[in-house]
């Protein structure tokens, strides 16, 4: 899978750009705040219709312009696709091969993209929000059904919270039941994904760290008390919501559930958030991203497009070398942003394209 060209109009600080990409490595360099990450964000939007920066549609449109337009050309197994995404007051509208897209399923998968950002480097030592967000994004990269389920869960959560905010029990049981059902399916998919990639994380961690430490992933739900753990499926979440109902009515919000769960990154049975060195934490996250790429390649019979957002500055020379060796062997298309080209390990890479980004202007070199 390759992105061969992209056109950007009135997007963030990029007024207009047309960029032709190399099929292997593409390096975008320049000072901070010039538009490098916006190019990666545009590619990601053309694959998922979502921003990896948690931005709302108005945030994506250039100042004093009515809308933004992204167009990309992608190729897989010799078959080309033209993808267009309109971003405006009316929301987001997509076309594939110049035909309007009415179902997300018709848009999803034309560009399979994985993002690796400094935010993810930090998630091993951060609070649960970053790890949960990473997990959700990793799963829906290969499972459209998970994305739809995630939307459904949060729609139900919003409705239930509205009732709780009013302090009303009328109709609460109905929303609680639906939320528990969707939440159970969400948790099952999360735990299933972690079970799939854990052996890959273990393998890549050993290759990076060069030791015998055993890496592991543990989903950490709120179902921690013996009376809840002993229950199965939806009954467990119903019991959890029931146990906290008085508190939730008092606070006006849902305080437990999959939207509050966490994932533990573990080495030799110890959670690295509290017991791991910075080097161990960074090696673990690097192994996790490698596992995500490997998993998607197996799932789709083709590696995804990788978007590396200023990662070279976050990794030491050895881990940078580990990552670049992995990417060379994968034969995948890679987009790299950096403020300092000298930090990249491009030796041995036969072909790559370089671009300088300044004040929203992208210049090929």
Swiss-Prot record:
Entry's Gene Ontology BP terms: DNA replication; DNA synthesis involved in DNA repair; double-strand break repair; SOS response
Sequence positions that bind ATP: 30-37
Gene: recF
Record keyword Transcription regulation present: no
Family: Belongs to the RecF family.
Entries under InterPro entries matching the protein: DNA-binding_RecF, DNA-binding_RecF_CS, P-loop_NTPase, RecF/RecN/SMC_N, RecF_2
Any Pfam family matching the protein: SMC_N
UniProt keyword annotations, A-Z: ATP-binding, Cytoplasm, DNA damage, DNA repair, DNA replication, DNA-binding, Nucleotide-binding, SOS response
Coiled-coil intervals: none
UniProt xrefs under PANTHER family: DNA REPLICATION AND REPAIR PROTEIN RECF
GO cellular component: cytoplasm
HAMAP family: RecF (MF_00365)
Function summary: The RecF protein is involved in DNA metabolism; it is required for DNA replication and normal SOS inducibility. RecF binds preferentially to single-stranded, linear DNA. It also seems to bind ATP.
Domain of life: Bacteria
Classification via PROSITE patterns: RECF_2
Compartment list: Cytoplasm
Protein name: DNA replication and repair protein RecF
UniProt cross-references to NCBIfam families, sorted A to Z: recf (TIGR00611)
A molecular function GO annotation: single-stranded DNA binding
């Amino acid at each position: 899978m390759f992105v061969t060209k992209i056109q950007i109009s009135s997007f963030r600080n990029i007024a207009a750009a047309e960029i032709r990409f190399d099929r292997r490595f593409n390096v975008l360099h320049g000072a901070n705040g010039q538009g490098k990450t916006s190019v990666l964000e545009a590619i990601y939007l053309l694959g998922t219709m979502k921003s990896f920066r948690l931005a709302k549609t108005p945030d994506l449109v250039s100042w004093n312009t009515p809308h933004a337009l992204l167009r990309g050309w992608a190729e897989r197994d010799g078959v080309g696709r033209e993808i267009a995404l309109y971003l405006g007051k009316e929301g987001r509208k997509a076309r594939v091969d110049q035909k309007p897209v009415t179902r997300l399923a018709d848009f999803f998968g034309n560009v399979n993209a994985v993002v690796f950002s400094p935010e993810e480097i930090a998630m091993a030592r951060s609070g649960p929000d970053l790890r949960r967000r990473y997990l959700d994004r990793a799963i829906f990269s290969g499972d459209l059904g998970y994305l739809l389920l995630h939307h459904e869960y949060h729609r139900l959560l919003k409705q239930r919270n509205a009732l709780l905010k009013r302090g009303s029990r009328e109709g609460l049981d109905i929303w609680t039941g639906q939320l528990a059902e969707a939440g159970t399916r969400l948790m099952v998919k999360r735990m299933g994904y972690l079970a799939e990639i854990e052996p890959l994380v273990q393998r890549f961690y050993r290759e990076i760290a060069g030791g015998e430490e055993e890496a592991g992933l543990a989903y950490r739900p709120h179902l921690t008390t013996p009376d809840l753990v002993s229950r199965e499926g939806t009954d467990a979440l119903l019991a959890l919501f029931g146990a906290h109902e008085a508190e939730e009515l008092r606070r006006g919000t849902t305080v437990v559930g999959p939207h509050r769960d966490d994932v533990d990154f573990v080495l030799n049975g110890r959670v690295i958030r509290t017991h791991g060195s910075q080097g161990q934490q960074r090696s673990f996250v690097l192994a996790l991203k490698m596992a995500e790429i490997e998993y998607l390649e197996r799932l789709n019979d083709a590696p995804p497009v990788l978007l590396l957002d200023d990662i070279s500055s976050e990794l030491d020379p050895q881990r940078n070398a580990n990552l670049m060796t992995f990417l060379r062997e994968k034969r995948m298309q890679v987009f790299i942003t950096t403020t300092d080209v000298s930090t990249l390990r491009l030796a041995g890479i036969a072909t790559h394209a370089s671009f300088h980004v300044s004040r929203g202007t992208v210049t090929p070199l």
